[in-house]
UniProtKB/Swiss-Prot annotation:
Residues 1-248 are annotated as: tRNA (mnm(5)s(2)U34)-methyltransferase. GO terms for cellular component: cytoplasm. HAMAP family: MnmC. Residues 282-690 are annotated as: FAD-dependent cmnm(5)s(2)U34 oxidoreductase. This is tRNA 5-methylaminomethyl-2-thiouridine biosynthesis bifunctional protein MnmC. GO terms for molecular function: flavin adenine dinucleotide binding; oxidoreductase activity, acting on the CH-NH group of donors; tRNA (5-methylaminomethyl-2-thiouridylate)(34)-methyltransferase activity. It is found in: Cytoplasm. Its cofactor is FAD. InterPro entries: FAD-dep_OxRdtase, FAD/NAD-bd_sf, MnmC-like_methylTransf, SAM-dependent_MTases_sf, tRNA_MAMT_biosynth_bifunc_MnmC, tRNA_MNMC2, tRNA_S-uridine_synth_MnmC_C.
């Protein structure tokens, strides 16, 4: 049996009353009462946490709520409604953004969720985007964004006993408020326990509150033991009592002492005394575009510097790119990352397209069984037992029927996959960012060097931003308080990043004119290369992979190589033979890759300090805090799947900069940190040779 089996998510088993009230067959309990569900939820959770008054008095930009048990999403939807009303009535209040994290072990199927939410037409404005983005049953965090209302939902699928400890908690805490919901303690005793209460306590910010419908004595005592000051108040309607409380100052102090150092991330928050609203991003591809929009939506002023004469000039400049996840048999951290990032990217592209039209089609992707090695690899992916909505096997006949042309091979079908226009998407995202906030774009500006500003001494210059950076271009220099490099392989040109383990690979994509033989192709084909359906009378066929080759000149031989790969993998078909490559229509880009396929995202570590800091790492049991350059970040190493991963990676980095909950478990976060290979070597007692 595959190691992935224990990571699979099971759906809730629902049966319905005559009044369409959903009941859980597993827990023998009701999700909500159709007559009183809204009033009870508002009374227990919104009023119980005194959110109306707290939002009015709140001085920060974003407020974070966590919930045990997403269920039908009613608590989330009602909170959305309350928050939208609050923003409308208080447009000048500092609070602008709501972050809601919910933990669900047995998510409803989408059809069941649709039925359940039909009860609440007054919540349609929030139900519609929820249903549009509702994920398939995959383990981990699914980030859903309601841009119109400035609300983000992190929907964590899995046992909260596993998922909650996997969250990265800042030293200032993570959540302002907890909804302790779920089925009654008598029905679901496994969830309601002291371990959970302690984890909830450790996630709390200063002044965090908690509310729950139950008044069970062991719940009250468990929360008190975990560091909450608890009280009782009148329960809703006929219920005698319910519990409310807040985190104690003693618990906050004790929780800080329990925090362990991080090998891969700084455990301490950076200086927040001065808001770092001025961000410089270096780059011109999908990573820099997505990050620009993510930071704009958080109120930052962003300046984008691109060394080329246009955006999407490099690897992001192809006419078409395939979109599908990188999966494996174990459905390990890498597979989970790409699966959930893929689902987020789909939603992201559809949302961008609503205001900035982009050519794309989610008509599916086929991975072909073109030789024994590929067949073995694809069969292993199937053994993971992932949902058919994500990946399924097709017979030869089914493959031909769905492709629209003759292939005569089995395939793996990704029904949600497809293709998109990379250059159009990058340009659309940047236009959207300009429409939503303060983004300035500077082309033909190559960053040569940068260093920490020498005047960063608040005692000498109180008006100077703390830990800002001086950026030096060919004809001028400028200062920004925060710097992000989204510079692909050019990252290695900067002294602060010279030791980052990156590789470069040249790739040429052939643009081929359609004809009557190939035009019927309805779906993207992936083999050793790929072939897209026609867009504007043209297909994309690719791509070559020339490791360490930085030459960006057109190559006729690589046109031939792309066609040869297609004919080798799909032999004996007249339609492949009639593809015309006798022209210079192609795009050459340099991919930036990492050895383990994980990208690099996060704060940039100090390499020299790391060698000193971790010289005894092989003997230490507990890690110490890793040394990082202040206010300096990296987003690179996206490889050939940047359009699958970049939107969620940008969200993650913007969330980290803004001290919001992150959309990845620690296992995935650690795997994406820049210093991961350095630390692994040092922990094994091996020297770093750079």
């Amino acid at each position: 049996m595959s190691d992935a089996k224990y990571k699979l998510i099971k759906h809730a088993q629902i049966h319905w009353s005559d009044q369409l009230e959903p009941f859980s067959s597993l827990f023998d309990d009701i999700y909500f009462n159709t007559e009183q569900g809204i009033d009870e939820a508002n009374y227990v959770f919104f009023d119980g946490n005194k959110l109306g008054k707290r939002w009015l008095d709140y001085s920060a930009q974003h407020f974070s709520i966590a919930e045990t048990g997403f269920g039908t999403g009613l608590n989330f939807l009602l909170t959305c409604q309350k928050f939208a009303e609050f923003i409308k009535l208080n447009p000048n209040n500092p609070l602008k953004k709501l972050h809601f994290s919910s933990f669900e072990k047995y998510p409803l199927t989408k059809p069941d969720l649709i039925i359940a939410l039909q009860q609440w037409p007054q919540l349609t404005a929030f139900i519609t985007p929820l249903l549009a983005q509702y994920p398939i049953a995959l383990k981990g965090c699914h980030r859903l964004v309601l841009n119109e209302f400035n609300i983000t939902l992190d929907l964590w699928f899995g046992d909260i006993a596993d998922t909650l400890p996997s969250l990265h908690v800042y030293d200032c805490g993570l959540f302002d408020c907890w909804y302790l919901d779920g089925f009654a303690p008598s029905k679901n005793p496994e969830m309601w326990n002291d371990d959970l209460f302690q984890l909830i306590s450790q996630s709390c910010k200063k002044d965090a509150t908690i509310a729950t419908f139950t008044a069970a004595s062991f719940v009250r005592k468990g929360l008190i033991k975990a560091g909450f000051e608890m009280g009782k108040q009148k329960g809703y309607d006929k219920k005698r009592e319910m519990l409310i409380g807040h985190i104690s100052t003693e618990a906050l102090a004790a929780n800080k002492l329990k925090q362990h150092g991080q090998y891969y991330r700084p455990a301490k928050s950076e200086n927040t005394a001065q808001k770092k609203t001025d961000v410089a991003i270096i780059g011109g591809g999908i990573a820099s575009a997505c990050l620009s929009l993510a930071l704009i939506r958080r109120g930052y002023k962003v300046t984008l510097y691109c060394k080329e004469s246009s955006l999407a000039f490099g690897a992001s400049g192809n006419q078409q790119a395939a979109l599908y996840p990188l999966l494996n048999e174990q459905h390990d951290a890498l597979s989970q990352f790409f699966a959930n990032a893929f689902l987020y990217s789909r939603n992201y592209i559809k949302q961008i397209n609503q205001t900035q039209p982009v050519d794309y089609s989610f008509s599916g992707v086929l991975q072909l069984y073109y030789d024994p090695s590929a067949s073995k690899k694809l069969d292993k992916i199937l053994q993971a037992g992932l949902p058919q909505e994500l990946v399924e096997q097709l017979t030869e006949i089914e493959t031909d029927n769905i492709a629209g042309i003759s292939i005569a091979q089995k395939s793996l079908h990704y029904p949600l996959g497809g293709w998109l226009s990379p250059k159009q998407l990058v340009e659309a995202i940047v236009r959207q960012a300009k429409n939503e906030g303060d983004l300035s774009v500077h082309l033909n500006q190559e960053l040569l060097t940068f260093e920490q500003s020498p005047s960063d001494n608040p005692a000498l210059n109180p008006a100077q931003p703390i830990n800002s950076w001086d950026l030096h271009f060919a004809k001028h220099s400028i200062q920004h308080s925060l710097l992000v490099l989204a510079t692909a392989n050019n990252t290695l040109n900067f002294k602060q990043c010279e030791a980052v383990p990156l590789s470069a690979a040249r790739g040429q994509v052939t643009h081929i004119p359609t004809n009557h033989k190939i035009n019927p192709l309805q779906i993207t084909l992936c083999h050793e290369g790929y072939l897209t359906p026609a867009n504007n009378q043209q297909h994309c066929m690719g791509a070559t992979f020339k490791r360490h080759d930085l030459n960006q000149a057109f190559s006729q031989q690589e046109q031939v190589d792309n066609k040869d790969k297609l004919e080798k993998c799909i032999p004996g078909k007249t339609w492949t033979e009639q593809i015309d490559i006798n022209h210079p229509n192609a795009h050459v880009g340099i991919r930036c890759t990492t050895r383990d396929h994980f990208p690099y995202v996060g704060a940039i570590p100090d390499y020299q300090a790391t060698k000193i800091h971790y010289k005894n790492a092989a003997k230490e049991v507990n890690p110490v805090n890793a040394p990082f350059h202040p206010n300096l970040y990296l987003l690179t190493g996206l490889g050939s799947r940047g359009f699958c991963s970049a939107p969620l990676l940008a969200e993650m980095l913007a969330s980290q900069i803004n001290k919001e909950p992150l959309p990845f478990a620690k296992e995935i976060l650690n795997a994406m940190q820049i210093n991961r290979q350095w630390i692994n070597y040092l922990k094994k007692g091996k020297p770093l040779h750079y």
